[in-house]
Amino acid sequence: MSRSLTKGPFIADHLLKKIQKLNAQGKKKVIVTWSRASTIVPLMIGHTIAVHNGREHIPVFITDQMVGHKLGEFSPTRTYRGHIKTKGDKKSKR
């Protein structure tokens, strides 16, 4: 279910302030955040935002195609190692 248009997109206040400050200075710096629920807006294009995935911060470079998505979509939280075979597993060979 999508968010109501009258409410507007959710962006964490601290993240928005950091981006506006960097845009005013004209600098591009990695911004560290834990806010995975924040929506990507056009102000963020060209910045690199390090999004926390529960263990570490994953750097995400924001492009124009990402606008409207959430930051958490680009920082996976689970590592899939495949279906690992054990050494003595004879049943899987049948």
From Swiss-Prot:
Biological process annotations from GO: ribosomal small subunit assembly; translation
Family annotation (Pfam families): Ribosomal_S19
A Gene Ontology molecular function term of the record: rRNA binding
Record GO cellular component, one term: chloroplast
Keywords: Chloroplast, Plastid, Ribonucleoprotein, Ribosomal protein, RNA-binding, rRNA-binding
Organism superkingdom: Eukaryota
Protein localization: Plastid, Chloroplast
UniProt family annotation: Belongs to the universal ribosomal protein uS19 family.
HAMAP family (UniProt xref): Ribosomal_uS19 (MF_00531)
Record PANTHER family: RIBOSOMAL PROTEIN S19P FAMILY MEMBER, SMALL RIBOSOMAL SUBUNIT PROTEIN US19M
Reported function: Protein S19 forms a complex with S13 that binds strongly to the 16S ribosomal RNA.
Full protein name: Small ribosomal subunit protein uS19c
Organism the protein comes from: Pleurastrum terricola
